[in-house]
Every structure is written in structure tokens, then in C-alpha cells.
Amino acid sequence: MKLNKYIDHTLLKQDAKKKQIDSLLSEAREYGFASVCVNPTWVEHAKKGLEGTDVKVCTVVGFPLGATTSAVKAFETKEAIQNGADEIDMVINVGALKSGNLALVESDIRAVVEASGDKLVKVIIEACLLTDQEKVVVCQLAQKAGADFVKTSTGFSTGGATIADVTLMRETVGSDMGVKAAGGARSYADALAFVEAGATRIGTSAGVAILKGELADGDY
């Protein structure tokens, strides 16, 4: 198994410096990760830094709270793609889901899907804040809205991916969608366990350590 191709090599910290982003890009080129995941302000820089490779540029929308309006999320998506983004990781409107406003949750996802054109859209459900029933419902809504992936976590809330959540999400969406486990993978064994549970992507800042068989310091 080429585990490197499962990894979205991630740096989303608000205080990330250019030299840290450059290091992320250098590692992505060396290890051939699936993508780098960076904040929108770094997309154009990342695109230039990865020219000549097959590493994709992934960015985030409505991040990390998911509480911006659908129009704002759609604008963010369009601008990110204009700047070179290949993949969009959007955050759902968690408050709307908790309030039972499923129509808003679905239309919010659909707004990003439509704005993304042919680019990949991953829907962050922030599983640590949801009941199992809510996880099932929102995965179904993401599927209905035409998204490509469901993703466990932002890495900025109360917890990251768990095997139980990845298993439930995979069972819910079947084989038609990708499942991204974000946070929670701190070792090669962790990453492998997520893949075996049904993950087709792993979001982590510790991709290099994982591939080297080392134990990572952080959770994301």
C-alpha cells in the first residue's frame, strides 16, 4: 500500500509562517503526498511551489466554524479555485444541523459543490460535536448535495477522527464517496487502521513522521 497517496499533508495553523509552508511543500514534493492542505491565503503560493508534481493543492472553506453564509462559502470556493486550488474542504453549518434545519445544511453544501465546478469537495462534519444519528444524517445530505468526500474534523474543535466515526461514515455513504479521517493519526499503525476502517484520505500534519514509522507529536 502506498500510504503517502492517502495523506493530505496539512498546515492550517493561523500563525503559520512562509518558511513553514515552504517546508510543507518541500516535504510534499519529496514524499509524493496526495495533497497539501493550507489556508486560502497560501493557495497561490502552494500552487507555484508544487508545479511539475502531481501533488494537489487543497484548501478550506467556512473554516473552522462553518458559520459563514452559503454565499460567502461559495465566493471563498470560487476565489480559491481561481488561485489554483484543486480540492475544497468545507465545514458544514453545524448549528443548522443541530437545529434540525436540514434544508439549510444541504443547500449550504450544494452551494460549494456548484461553485467548485469539477474540483473535489470534501465536507467536514465536525463529528466530535455530533450524535451518531446526526453523523448519519449529514453524511446522507452531503451525498445528496453531490459532494465527493465526507471528512471527520477540522482539527480545531474538541477532537479528531476516531475509528468508530470513520467506520460509521463509510457504512453510511457506501462506496460512492471518499471518507477523510482528519486528526487522530499519530503513527503508521494509526493511519493504517483508519484506512482499514474505510478512510480513503488522511488529514495530518505528521505525514512525514508517519511514513518514517515515528510517533508524531501533535494530533493533526
From Swiss-Prot:
Its EC number is 4.1.2.4. Pathway: Carbohydrate degradation; 2-deoxy-D-ribose 1-phosphate degradation; D-glyceraldehyde 3-phosphate and acetaldehyde from 2-deoxy-alpha-D-ribose 1-phosphate: step 2/2. InterPro entries: Aldolase_TIM (IPR013785), DeoC (IPR011343), DeoC/FbaB/LacD_aldolase (IPR002915), DeoC_typeI (IPR028581). It catalyses: 2-deoxy-D-ribose 5-phosphate = D-glyceraldehyde 3-phosphate + acetaldehyde. Keywords: Cytoplasm, Lyase, Schiff base. It comes from the Bacteria. Signal peptide: none annotated. The active site is at 89 (proton donor/acceptor), 151 (schiff-base intermediate with acetaldehyde), 180 (proton donor/acceptor). It is found in: Cytoplasm. It is an enzyme of class 4 (lyase). CDD domains: DeoC. Pfam families: DeoC. Gene3D superfamilies: Aldolase class I. Belongs to the DeoC/FbaB aldolase family. DeoC type 1 subfamily. NCBIfam families: deoC. Catalyzes a reversible aldol reaction between acetaldehyde and D-glyceraldehyde 3-phosphate to generate 2-deoxy-D-ribose 5-phosphate. This is Deoxyribose-phosphate aldolase. It comes from Streptococcus pneumoniae (strain CGSP14). The gene is deoC.
